[in-house]
Amino acid sequence: RSTLDRSSAASDVYKRQEVLTLGVFHFDFPNLDMQQISEEDQINVLSPVYQKEIELIASKLANFNPDAIVIEHPLGGQQKIDSLFKAYLAGNHKLSKSEVQQLGFRIAKMCKAKIYCADARGTQTARIEELLEDDSTKQYQDFEESFVNSPDSSLYSKDQLIFKQKGILPQLIHLNDPRQIKKDLGNYLIGHFKYESDKGDYTGADFESGRWFNRNLRIFRNIQRTPKSAKRILVIFGAAHMNLLNYLFECSPEYKLLNVNDYLKTNS
């Protein structure tokens, strides 16, 4: 048989893992992202009206029936998450505000799924590390200024915040719209991405390569470590991560990416 025939046969036999990615706003509003949310615009997800809505969202996503749930929590925190989830199953832990627990724990309980931590920090080049090391230098301060007063400010795409007016479910549907995800990636290609310490250098591009692109590649690598026995994987991360993670899943021969809005928009 030809190499092409063997390759085709192997592809037919290989069963890709199904993946559902859910991009979220952070339910506990830590305000660590570029877009800050003022206290008056925040919601308390522990209030009865939002708890009822979160239960509905969890039940919709549980229809995917994941074997594994991947969450935005440091890889080194796996033992702590396992302990909290075990306590939750035993009725000895009250869920915190975070989407990790409000959605991740609920769905894992409903589907008897295993939870996996997958967050990581990106690595920077030695030159960028040196730049970030001392915030008293003019070079550092000029770089910081590129965040605050960027000539590209008018080009940034801001998330439309509708959770307070319309609810959590409409917000999640909006955040996971492919058009919105594509716009979001554009934010990482302007502003400080174009910053140059010296004319013609790549300070901004190198910084963003480590902070965002390398970080998400590492997250993807952590997800690849999920056991192959998991036929269906639900990934719950901040919505911005989907601008790279979804693309990686779409390109990978190991996974079949499904549309999360097909689940969120169902009436069940």
Feature-to-residue mapping (PLM):
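Proline-aspartate-enriched helix->loop->beta-strand connector
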Residues: 65-71
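N-terminal post-signal-peptidase region of extra-cytosolic proteins
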Residues: 46-58, 88-90
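A cross-kingdom marker for long, charged
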Residues: 206-268
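Hydrophobic, often amphipathic alpha-helical segments used for membrane interaction and targeting
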Residues: 81-228
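Acidic/histidine-rich helix-loop elements
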Residues: 28-49
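Single conserved hydrophobic/aromatic residue that forms the stacking wall/gate
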Residues: 1-10, 14
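Short catalytic/ligand-binding loop motif for oxyanion handling, primarily in non-cytosolic enzymes
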Residues: 28-31, 77-81, 124-128, 242-245
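Short, well-ordered beta-to-alpha junction loops that form the rim of enzyme active sites
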Residues: 71-76, 120-121, 237-240
